[in-house]
Amino acid sequence: VIVTRNVTWNLPRPDLAYREWLRVLKPGGVLYNFDADWYGHLYNEEKRNSYEKDRHQTEEQQVEDYYRGTDIEKMEEIARQVPLSRLERPKWDLETMTKTGFLDVSCDEAVWKEVWTEEEIINNSTSPIFLLTGRKRAAFHLKNITVEPGQKWNGELELADGEIRLPATVLHGHAEGKTMLITAGVHAGEYVGIQAAIELSQKLKIEKVIGTIIIVKVMNRPAFEHRNGSMGLTDGRNLNREFPGNPDGTEMERLAWAVSQELQPVADFYIDLHSGDDYEKLTPYVYYAGAAPENVVKISREMAEQV
């Protein structure tokens, strides 16, 4: 948890404060920022009149005037040099927090009733303190992989207790959303799909990712590395015909089982890239699940139309 009070208003780049708070928070952590539109009266006539009303009110009720006890000219000079005195708050804060990547962003504009003394209320009744709250997205966990929000991971994804190691990229965006699984190399000789997955993993910008994207560049890795075409290296089986697989079966059966049990269940959407094998020439096309529940067929078709 990060708790701050009256920090942002006097910063030349208050947006950087929100960026740094998000950076240092642990995944799932929360920011509580107490602040107020302290010097909006310098640029708004209505707020100026309200500010003067507060000053008269402190005098009438014979309480200490917090502003009179400071160097007003110096403080206003400082306030004119920083951007938040001119911006509408907390609207600016809410928009900036959302843009930065905070989740569940909210503002409690009545918190002053709980935290201010009667004297503080008299002094600042027309510029009440508010409480801004935002949460950092939780990290993404999959087998041997942990990826924090806003991060991109490259390496080997381990399935079946490390027996299977697949080259993969995971992009875990700041903003929450769906999880997309993209695979290639089910047939190890279909190089176009594999190359497409590699290029996609390199070109995707983490700043634009909403949700999580998992890219497995080569599923049938042994056959790919030995240039053994599209069948299993040791069993000669077609991985694309072995799902859901068998944990005690042959090489391709075990791979199919690991993927169907450990990888596919984490995804909301799944795209499997294929192409012509090294001896084939194919016309580009996209097909989608037809023998499935109606809602799956509908969503799959919508995906296929966009691809």
Predicted regions and their residues:
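Structured catalytic-domain cores with a bias toward divalent-metal coordination
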Residues: 140-307
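Conserved class I S-adenosyl-L-methionine
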Residues: 30-70
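A conserved beta-strand element that flanks and buttresses the S-adenosyl-L-methionine
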Residues: 3
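A short glycine-rich, Lys/Arg-flanked "PGG" loop and its adjoining helix->strand segment in the class I
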Residues: 15-30
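Core SAM-dependent methyltransferase catalytic element
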Residues: 100-101, 117-138
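Short "lid" loop at the C-terminus of a central beta-strand within the Rossmann-like core
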Residues: 36-41, 110-112, 221, 276
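Short alpha-helix
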Residues: 84-108
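Short catalytic micro-motifs in class I SAM-dependent methyltransferases
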Residues: 6-7
